[in-house]
A protein has these predicted regions:
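Short alpha-helical donor nucleotide-sugar binding micro-motif in glycosyltransferases
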Residues: 68, 130, 233, 241-246, ...
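Nucleotide-sugar donor phosphate/pyrophosphate-binding loop at the beta->alpha transition
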Residues: 98-100, 109-128
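Donor nucleotide-sugar binding/catalytic pocket of nucleotide-sugar-dependent glycosyltransferases
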Residues: 124-172, 176, 180
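Conserved donor-binding/catalytic core segment of Leloir-type glycosyltransferases
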Residues: 176-210
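Nucleotide-activated donor-binding/catalytic signature segment of Leloir-type glycosyltransferases, i.e.
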Residues: 219-237
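Aromatic "clamp/platform" in nucleotide-sugar-dependent glycosyltransferases that forms part
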Residues: 254
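Short hydrophobic beta-strand element within catalytic cores of glycosyltransferases
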Residues: 271-274
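A charged, aromatic-enriched C-terminal amphipathic alpha-helix characteristic of glycosyltransferases
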Residues: 305-344, 349
Length: 350
């Protein structure tokens, strides 16, 4: 199959969306599919306000169409709802091409947290965007149910995996030697308001709090929490070394759809402490590998008693190979010659 994946999220961003799409590209390519990633670096773009590492590529559906006509895919997946996703959606509708889409990020909740715009105002826009999709792929049963309750159609469960060859237990030493006393309490992720990091940092609890990641709030948090260890963004084996140095992985977010970092921590033998909300409820499904509690300090204290071996065994059941097969099964194949056909909708159709 020749698969075109359109995404506004791509390197140098490092987040769950980029990691998931990278895994899909690699897994599908390994099984013999041809995969083309249509991403912002191929076009003129500007930094996203308040998220400078995110590039917004403002292009026409014609520019997207040129790439589509050159690659001649037999399936198109629109991964994000940004400018590239909008242009690709418009091109597909004009040519009568089926496409699938995905719900990776709870943007309405993020917008509400940052700009105080009610989430209920934003969801109709996302429902419109995904309304013509053959399959709207969502990462967990909770997200599937939530979207269906909001009127989204054709929502399908598409789980997530973890690279167990990279994320695995190791020695508590090396590049991630962490100063401080007591257990090491780790957070990995974007340092931004939607991650609810202050709920973790405000806890009066024994141990050393370590923050791995970068983002718009890092300078402010460094100033307000001088006893917290901030190490910036880490990748690959450097990131793994921080997981290996941790006793508990703390995930304070209330808005994530999944949270790949929780699976990465578990694969390294680190139990998870989180709130009982969307994301953690679908990842930490066994009380042997983590604790979900409205009191995050209780969740941490409980997680400290759990067995690392149980965490590793749990994570090994989540493979990217199975995830890619599910993704591929939802794709809507079409005859590539349709790409060069006449427009079936007017320029104003949506």
């Amino acid at each position: 199959m020749r698969i075109l994946i359109v995404s506004d999220a791509w390197y140098p961003q490092i987040n769950g969306v980029v990691r998931t799409l990278t895994a899909m590209r690699d897994q599908l390519s390994a099984r013999g599919d041809e995969v083309y990633m249509l991403t912002p670096e191929r076009f003129w773009s500007i930094p996203c306000p308040t998220y400078s590492e995110i590039r917004l590529a403002f292009i026409s559906s014609g520019a997207v169409g040129k790439v589509v006509k050159e690659f001649m895919p037999s399936a198109i997946h629109i991964a994000t709802e940004g400018p590239l996703g909008l242009a690709a959606r418009r091109f597909c509708l004009k040519r009568g091409l089926p496409f699938t889409s995905a719900f990776h990020t709870r943007f309405p909740e993020y917008i509400e947290a940052r700009f105080r715009i009610p989430a209920d105002w934003s969801y109709p826009l996302l429902r419109w965007f995904h309304g013509r999709s053959s399959a709207v792929m969502a990462p967990t049963p909770t997200v599937v149910d939530s979207l269906a309750a909001r009127g989204f159609k054709n929502v399908r469960l598409w789980g997530r995996g973890v690279d167990i060859d990279l994320f695995k237990p190791g020695h508590r030493q090396g590049t991630a030697d962490v100063p401080g006393k007591g257990p090491t309490l780790l957070f990995v992720g974007r340092v931004a308001i939607e991650k609810n990091i202050t709920a973790f940092l405000d806890l009066k609890i024994d141990g050393t709090k370590v923050i791995v990641g970068d983002g718009p709030m890092i300078a402010e948090l460094r100033s307000h929490y001088p006893d917290v260890v901030f190490v910036g963004a880490k990748h690959g084996r450097d990131l793994v070394s921080y997981y290996n140095a941790a006793d508990v992985f703390v995930f304070p977010s209330l808005t994530d759809t999944f949270g790949l970092v929780m699976l990465e921590a578990l694969a390294c033998g680190v139990p998870v402490a989180a709130f009982p909300v969307m994301g953690p409820k679908d990842v930490v499904t066994d009380d042997k590998v983590g604790c979900l509690d409205e009191d995050l300090s209780v969740a941490i204290e409980t997680a400290l008693t759990l067995c690392p071996e149980d965490c590793v065994a749990f994570a090994k059941k989540r493979s990217w190979t199975a995830c890619a097969e599910t993704f591929r099964s939802y794709l809507h194949q079409f005859d590539p010659t349709m790409i060069h056909g006449a427009d079936v909708l007017s320029a104003t159709a949506s």
